[in-house]
Amino acid sequence: MPAKKRKGDAISGIGSMSSRKMKRKKPINSDLMVDIKPLTDNQQKFFDEYKAGKNLFAYGAAGTGKTFIALYLALKEVLDQITPYEKVYVVRSLVATREIGFLPGDHEDKSSLYQIPYKNMVKYMFEMADDNEFEMLYGALKAQETIRFWSTSFLRGTTMDNCIIIVDEMQNLNFHELDSIITRVGENCKIIFCGDAAQSDLVTVSYTHLRAHETLRYLV
């Protein structure tokens, strides 16, 4: 995991921005986020390519910080007052429960179990006095839809605009799911794919499935 540093007394000075630059009010002050630095050359490359404004394909073994860095950089940019991005969408396939529609509850109830790792990541990104303060902050992020979680089973009819999309565990996506995600991308969007073929939960991996992933790596 990348290293994080405490911020000093430096404040970004939101009040000094002109109203012309402040496109909208963000629900959380980005100054609450800790300063996280890359620990490896590959992590540094991830930071650099992201800052260059590119769509990314983060491919690597477990524990290399793919999803953490993607979520950190995305949240930091979304909470910046002058960027066009308003939301972070975390999209993944719930392979073991791909028939998730048969489970009781709404989409939030069905996907809540899979949100726990991301909540833990977000906790590491903010400097809060105690757990209660973090719960309030995280609740605000969710309530304002600054961060949203989607299963590929519920993307139909959705258009994602002004957002940063993180497609996590993408090695578990079939061709139909990949197509569903890409065709839902709207205006002012950035997309990051994170995955590792060695961690695939698919029962069978077809030649077509592998070719789709290889093609995607060259497209982003």
Residue ranges: model-predicted function:
Residues 145-164, 174-178:
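Conserved RecA-like ASCE ATPase "motif II neighborhood" in helicase/translocase motors
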Residues 208-215:
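Conserved small/polar residues in nucleotide/adenosyl-binding loops
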Residues 1-23:
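Interdomain "pre-motor" coupling segment immediately N-terminal to P-loop NTPase/helicase cores
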Residues 71-80:
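Walker A/P-loop NTP-binding motif
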